[in-house]
Amino acid sequence: MDMTKQIVDFEIKSELIGEIDQFEASDYTMAPPEEPKMVEESPQLGHLEDQNRKYSPEREVEPTLQDPSEVVDQMQKDTESVGEVKSPEKDVETELVKSKASPMNDQALTPPPRPLTSSEVVGLRDPEHTELRMCLEAKKSRSLPVSPQPQPNLKLAGSALFEFGQRSSPVETKIKTNPETKPPRRKIVPPSGEGQQFCLRWNNYQSNLTNVFDELLQSESFVDVTLSCEGHSIKAHKMVLSACSPYFQALFYDNPCQHPIIIMRDVSWSDLKALVEFMYKGEINVCQDQINPLLKVAETLKIRGLAEVSAGRGEGGASALPMSAFDDEDEEEELASATAILQQDGDADPDEEMKAKRPRLLPEGVLDLNQRQRKRSRDGSYATPSPSLQGGESEISERGSSGTPGQSQSQPLAMTTSTIVRNPFASPNPQTLEGRNSAMNAVANQRKSPAPTATGHSNGNSGAAMHSPPGGVAVQSALPPHMAAIVPPPPSAMHHHAQQLAAQHQLAHSHAMASALAAAAAGAGAAGAGGAGSGSGSGASAPTGGTGVAGSGAGAAVGSHHDDMEIKPEIAEMIREEERAKMIESGGHGGWMGAAAAATGAASVAADSYQYQLQSMWQKCWNTNQQNLVQQLRFRERGPLKSWRPEAMAEAIFSVLKEGLSLSQAARKFDIPYPTFVLYANRVHNMLGPSLDGGADPRPKARGRPQRILLGMWPEELIRSVIKAVVFRDYREIKEDMSAHQYANGQGHGTYIGGGTTTNGYHSAAAAKLAAQNAALAPPDAGSPLSSMTETLRRQILSQQQQHQQHHQQQAHHQQQPSHHQQQSPHAQSMNMYKSPAYLQRSEIEDQVSAAAAVAAAAAKHQQQQGERRGSENLPDLSALGLMGLPGLNVMPSRGSGGGSGGAAPNSAASYARELSRERERDRERERERELSRQYGSQSRGSSSGSGSAKSLTASQRPGAASPYSAAHYAKHQASAYNKRFLESLPAGIDLEAFANGLLQKSVNKSPRFEDFFPGPGQDMSELFANPDASAAAAAAAYAPPGAIRESPLMKIKLEQQHATELPHED
């Protein structure tokens, strides 16, 4: 390079300035130092421009001078952000040249030997803008026209030329590929008088280049895009793809992410592979039957050489492509802006220009405009507003506007073929983050939308957008108000509606929103496929005809880079699906999308559950990685943001443990993601420790419900404290008085709501009635489970209070101390089991039995202890026990009412039943012990079931005060020690089975298995053994499986019945 440079310098000095007019400005004749910025400007000036513009000579001169330098500069800019490095002499020379050149340069451009390819064609067209006219004719491979970056890259030939002179630092030269090899075809006049230049040409440059590209493809070196279809993928180079296909060019241009993954739908893998090979090598072999499909795909993807790509585009070939360097992210926006300009501008000046080019302008010309503007704004030196912008906004705004590659008209179809998936790690393009973009974006919106109507919206939007902070976050806040109304605006507006959306929607979370909106908009039919497609509003342009596909840009400017924006038409189906979710509820859910909601001010449109939306949003983020890096990383690692409130989780777990909902039912009911719920519920279940009923699952697992249910009974305080520990870790205390906290939707769970009066879940008719009532009362619009819960809670408590009062009146004579109603004795609470409706038949029996037993026992005990006074305070709270519709009890018994039968006198039916069952129980135990000893021959066996029997016989004579079973029972079932302790805290004489005899009548009709309770030959409720202990033992032996260690008073009935009948059914 150095040598080259020297040669060049030498030439520069030696060439005559006079020759300048023959050449296009060479880079040596670079713009003077003041202009370095401009210089970057427009490598892309093109013939288009030439055609459409009348330029004055001076203007031309300048461009020519600057042009190459611009190219160079741009490249430079791309590579290093430094300004041009020129040596002072050169600067001087350039000035000279400039002054002299200006008169002559006018004619100086050598006409290119062939029409320029699109890369050359794109030019800046602003009159005010000094345009450099660059017709580099460096040898170009026609097959590789241009990529969005190409201006700089592909012009390498030209730029490189210029580079020699221009750059003093070798570094710069290295940017160009082999500058030496590029033949400067035009003579370049060095500013100094030494007039001669040498053309260094690399003869097999093109073939070399293609070979190199192919090698890079094979080795996957420097690849920056992945194309995938049918489960296969191939890594390629954006530059090559863009050069060979305006479609890709536009696509990359719109989605400037570091390594996009493009998922091609409707493209077969063989075709894709063949096309890539074609783009890299320029030739492929295909069988005849493959040709048509291949050409069809090539047509869709606009592959040069296989499809008619440049037809109809500006003069030189497919100029429509956004020829831009990636660094200008705003191009798309500009593009749009240009389109808009076209359409909306009243300014005569731009209008005329447009008229000339209009046909191609729509998509393509726009490009030029944008580019020109873009460049200007980029350089900053030309920041003056160009009249062509609507309202005279400055280019900046143009930049913001969403320009999309012109290809859109033909494109929508193509677009559908690919989905860009953002590479999660691609860094966002920083530039867009600048605040200015938001302004631009606003502008863009106005501009882009074809009709004035759009501008209205866009303004609204833009205001919002403007403030949005560069990060994607702001976007969300920017949701334009009109967005709130889902009603789609007229198409033109629509499209831009979408755009805005897109813009807004950059926020990762907002995605769903936007897409839903866009979908709504698009779906509205305005945009049609193109519109629907890009959430980012690009679709909207379909109506415009111009920018359809690429529209994504406008919004992009707003918050983060386009990456964020990218819902491409390809994702239309997703969007459509989201239409179902209508629009994300803007309002309620936490700060989540609160900002957006606030901005939109719209009433939230209730959609599918919040959970669903969240999930879909997350899904979308996952699929398109459209979030800023942080969010996206977070999303990928940790799943969607937490969407449930701890209260809901607590209620859900309660409802599982008490109402017996399955985990999935509870998760759905409380809108908690199932996996999360399972984790929490199982944690709670594990921490609860052994169940009161002795642990083993009382319901055999049938095929239908594997382990999706948590079974067992625990004292309620225990459950509550565990849930508190698990769910409300440190940050939240569930109030001690649970009555404030109502678990389970509006159903009070016995003990803690409304004192003891609440019914237990749905367990009894009254409860069911109450539940229905609550459901009916619950405000229809209740926004969140929380509010509806509190509402139902309030109502429920009221109704309970009323009922409570009635009870008091009815039963005042029973209860001398009503004040104690609220305190339930612990055993009552623990007996308050929550059974699931799934097995109501049995659970109801148990509940009722145990409750009635408790009542009767308490009554009896009291009576024994204080014959004169029946204190209600220690009676168990029946209401908690699901006793509700038992024949002898009032519907909502309050604590002390034993019901007519239970509480009144010892000789009442309850106490009789108690005595009776006690005897039966004792007999059964003895009988059983005998049987066991027969079975095992001796106790030496040490088995828990047989070991204690001798002792236990004596012990059984005096069963513990409260234990309903004889000591023998415990001896045999040591596993129930826990239960035993629990039972000993019970009042003396509770015998569940006794109660079963009298009280179960009620559920006979409900329980198909009622007979199972008394299956023994003669052992039915009427039978009494002479010796009560013997009868109990016998009964036990008859009913319980020999090894059962899980019997406990509460579950005994259930166990026996299971033993008798269910074993055969277990699957």
Swiss-Prot record:
Keywords, in A-Z order: DNA-binding, Nucleus, Phosphoprotein, Transcription, Transcription regulation
Known tissue expression: Leg imaginal disk at the central region of the tarsus and in eye antenna disk at the basal cylinder.
GO cellular component: nucleus; polytene chromosome
Domain of life: Eukaryota
Modified residues (Phosphothreonine): T384
Segments forming domain HTH psq-type: 635-687
Biased segments, Low complexity type: 391-412, 812-829, 904-914, 934-949
Matches recorded under PROSITE patterns: BTB (PS50097), HTH_PSQ (PS50960)
Residues annotated with Phosphoserine modification: S56, S87, S147, S377
GO BP: any one term: female gonad morphogenesis
UniProt xrefs under CDD domains: BTB_POZ_BAB-like (cd18315)
Residue ranges of every copy of the BTB domain listed in the record: 223-288
Compartments, as annotated in UniProt: Nucleus
Gene3D superfamilies: Potassium Channel Kv1.1, Chain A
InterPro entries, alphabetized: BTB/POZ_dom, Dros_DevTransReg, Homeodomain-like_sf, HTH_Psq, SKP1/BTB/POZ_sf
Annotated region of DNA binding: 645-690, 697-708
Residue span of region Disordered: 30-121, 312-412, 444-505, 525-563, 796-829, 860-879, 891-967
Pfam families membership: BTB, HTH_psq
Post-translational modification Phosphotyrosine, affected residues: Y55
Gene Ontology MF term list: DNA-binding transcription factor activity; minor groove of adenine-thymine-rich DNA binding
Ranges of biased composition (kind: Gly residues): 525-538, 545-556
Composition bias type Basic and acidic residues, residue spans: 47-62, 86-98, 915-933
Stretches with biased composition (Acidic residues): 326-335
Function according to Swiss-Prot or TrEMBL: Probably acts as a transcriptional regulator. Required for the specification of the tarsal segment. Also involved in antenna development.
Protein name per UniProt: Protein bric-a-brac 2
